[in-house]
From Swiss-Prot:
Primary site of residence: mitochondrion
GO annotations of cellular component type: mitochondrial intermembrane space; mitochondrial matrix
Location in the cell: Mitochondrion matrix
Gene Ontology process terms (BP): mitochondrial respiratory chain complex II assembly; succinate metabolic process
Similarity remark: Belongs to the complex I LYR family. SDHAF3 subfamily.
Annotated Pfam families: Complex1_LYR_2
Protein name in UniProt: Succinate dehydrogenase assembly factor 3, mitochondrial
Key words, A-Z: Chaperone, Mitochondrion, Transit peptide
The protein's assembly and partners: Interacts with the iron-sulfur protein subunit within the SDH catalytic dimer.
Range of residues in the leader sequence: none
CDD domains (alphabetical): Complex1_LYR_SDHAF3_LYRM10
Function: Plays an essential role in the assembly of succinate dehydrogenase (SDH), an enzyme complex (also referred to as respiratory complex II) that is a component of both the tricarboxylic acid (TCA) cycle and the mitochondrial electron transport chain, and which couples the oxidation of succinate to fumarate with the reduction of ubiquinone (coenzyme Q) to ubiquinol. Promotes maturation of the iron-sulfur protein subunit of the SDH catalytic dimer, protecting it from the deleterious effects of oxidants. May act together with SDHAF1.
Length: 115
């Protein structure tokens, strides 16, 4: 039995994201992989409208990461969020964004620290 076409498209996008993450620094890769896994799992039972928006946003993300990892400036990763985009987020999304920011800015515990 074959999977529906939209399921195959979602799986292909998920694999593309994970493949792109392999080109990122290890600590960012781990964070990105976990976030992608959680988000794709969280949207398994999304409505058709939500699924379309979800796919659009993850395609934009994948295109952005692909551009950044293939550019000569490997130290430039990520993208600033516009105020209107932040203002359109729900409380839950703002909480997720804040958690992601905290995890991304957490100091690497493997590096020696000054006392």
């Amino acid at each position: 039995m074959s999977l529906p076409r939209h399921t195959l498209a979602i799986q292909a996008l998920y694999r593309r994201v994970l493949k792109l993450h392999r080109k990122l620094p290890l600590e960012i890769k781990a964070l990105g992989d976990q976030y992608a896994k959680d988000e794709f799992r969280r949207h398994k039972k999304a409505s058709q409208e939500q699924a379309v928006r979800f796919m659009q946003e993850w395609k934009i993300y994948a295109d952005t990461i692909e551009q950044q990892v293939n550019s000569q400036q490997l130290n430039v990763l990520g993208k600033d969020l516009k105020d209107e985009h932040i203002e359109s987020l729900t409380e839950e999304q703002l909480g997720q964004l804040y958690s992601l920011q905290e995890a991304a800015l957490k100091p690497d515990s493997s590096e020696p620290r000054d006392i």
